A protein has these predicted regions:
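Structural motif
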Residues: 34-39, 87-97, 137-141, 184-188, ...
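Short, conserved, GDST-rich strand-edge loop motifs in beta-rich repeat architectures
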Residues: 83-137, 223-225
Length: 391
């Protein structure tokens, strides 16, 4: 497997948590400081930084992010959902949290990227003793970024204290759908008018991101506390009602991995087929929105997580799966049974942890954005370097 690695040239960037391609530019949504957007130029192989599109982040002392919250519009602009770097309890990440989740030795890669003196408190508060939620975390914004002018304009604000933990963009119909941290609310946005509608709390967190079916319906999941099962969540933008369906996905959503539980990632293939991967056990499913039924296709990797899926020109699905070290997995939908799934190995076996969060595929190359290692790295896999697999 031939892989190139490029790092984002910004001191405060520590992860790539969203990605979208427009032409020959790949836009990288970051976890970092006030410059939360970087651009990879495919033709030159260079990553550059966009302007300071979130200047209000710079003064507070901890990261913001675009987390599964980026979508391209027909005119080439980007819709972005702002998030704050919060724990699942809705509190800012602190040095104590980092010591638990990311040992200080993991700062070594960031230091090697040209920032030799970085410390935990470049990216987080030492503790919460001086934190003021109303002043420092008043709530996020939905932004529209215009690459030709390198500026961002506000589309709308989220309700007080809430941030976009995900944001799906329906560019065809001019709408966006998201969920929040804290409190896991569902919301939708009319992008033409900037009107945001908050539909209230969903449940305990049950997905890393949602999916848009070809007909514009948005699907996710919710956890029923009565029996602990994970069930289908559905929002029809024409009906304008959030439905907590009784359709069972899993009787047990499984353990939390890196704080996530339930559904991890979705892909809508070119032919309209919808695939879904789960956090626990890295399970791959096919979802039929007509019947709202899930079919188990197999297990992708050890350790859990399915954090990205991309379809190539031949209909092969390339998947990032496994934790704490992501493997690249090849899935051929035309083959029935376990032989459809091939583990192509770890993304970068020389690292202690290489954990992928965002991706896109273009002209035979897979672009993978790394997270949870203090390294905002873009790993580029030449898929032609991977031996063809025959049934």
């Amino acid at each position: 497997m031939q892989i190139q690695e490029h790092s984002v040239p910004d001191r405060l960037a520590i992860a790539i948590t969203s990605m979208a391609r427009v032409g020959e530019k790949i836009y990288l949504g970051l976890t970092g400081g006030s410059r939360l957007l970087a651009i990879y130029d495919i033709s030159t192989g260079v990553i550059s930084m966009a302007s300071e599109i979130c200047p209000w982040i710079g003064a507070r002392g901890y990261c913001g992010k675009f987390h599964n919250a980026m979508g391209a519009m027909p005119d080439g602009s980007l819709i972005l959902g702002e998030c704050s770097h919060l724990t699942w309890e809705g509190l800012p990440v602190t040095a104590n949290y980092f010591r638990t989740e990311l040992p200080e030795r993991m700062l070594a890669r960031k230091r090697e990227q040209g920032f030799p003196d970085v410390t935990y408190t470049d990216f987080c508060l030492p503790d919460l003793s001086l934190w003021d939620r109303r002043k420092m975390d008043p709530g996020g914004r939905v932004l529209r970024y215009f690459p030709d002018r390198d500026i961002a304009e506000e589309v709308c604000s989220l309700p007080p204290f809430l941030y976009s933990q995900s944001l799906l963009v329906d560019s065809q119909r001019g709408r966006a759908f998201g969920h929040t941290i804290p409190d896991n609310h569902f919301f939708d946005v009319d992008l033409a008018t900037g009107k945001l509608t908050d539909h209230g709390r969903i449940s305990d967190y049950a997905f890393h991101q949602m999916v848009l079916a070809p007909d514009g319906t948005c699907y996710g999941a919710w956890i029923d506390r009565a029996d602990g099962a994970m069930k289908l969540l559905k929002f029809d933008p024409e009906e304008r009602r959030l439905r907590h369906s009784s359709r069972l996905i899993l009787r047990d959503p499984g353990s939390k991995i890196a704080g996530n539980q339930g559904i991890d990632h979705w892909l809508v293939a070119r032919d309209g087929t919808i695939f879904m991967g789960t956090v626990a056990n890295s399970l791959l499913w096919r979802f039929d929105p007509t019947t709202e039924e899930f079919t188990l296709l197999g297990r992708l990797a050890e350790g859990g997580r399915v954090t990205s899926m991309d379809e190539d020109e031949e209909g092969i699905i390339w998947i990032s799966a496994g934790y704490p070290h992501t493997h690249l997995v090849r899935f051929d939908p035309s083959i029935e049974g376990p032989q459809a799934i091939t583990d192509c190995g770890p993304i970068n076996p020389n690292l202690e942890r290489c954990y992928i969060h965002a991706s896109c595929l273009h002209k035979g190359k897979l672009y993978l954005g790394e997270t949870d290692g203090f390294s905002p790295s873009l790993h580029i896999v030449d898929l032609s370097s991977i031996s063809k697999v025959t049934p």
